[in-house]
Amino acid sequence: CKMSTKEEILSTYRRNINVKEQYDMPDLDALKGVEYSDPVAQFIAMSKAVGGDVVTLERGADVNEAIRKAYPEAKVFTSNVPGITIAQRNPDTVGSAQELNGTDVGIVQGEIGVAENGCVWVPQTMKERAVCFISEYLVILLSRNSIVSNMHQAYSRVRMTSYGYGCFISGPSKTADIAQALVMGAQAARGVTVILTD
């Protein structure tokens, strides 16, 4: 039986791999993340720089009214976040992700905000995570007390839910073609608003 080209390549590759010693991992303690004296202000500035928006919810204000004010033309809201009463759809009770198509505004809970790049860790806390990407606009609720300075700090706080999925979202979807023409909202939300709560 003659070996195929693939088998020959893999056989040669395996014969020539000689890992004789294990190298120590480099000391990463010297790599310190940036620290901001006011992480909330930096988070707001970076969120706007990447095309997002930030609304600071005043104590006692109704988050539903703040969302309606930010998106007055929206008709279909989707959320499973407790206290969101304007949602007509719930990503936990739809039969499939396709039923979320046509969502004007998806509303999700963020866990960690990162000042250095304006991103928010959004763990999957709903059956259909497509709400984060299929919605025309996305609202992320985030406690201002959950904003850290850098990604090192954020990664140390990330905890996975039972769904085993989460993602960092930084502003609206962005893509560029070979001519370097930036397009917002081509693959996911056309706009992202972070609402900072207590």
Q: What are these model-predicted stretches?
A:
Residues 2-198:
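The feature marks the mature, well-folded catalytic cores of soluble enzymes
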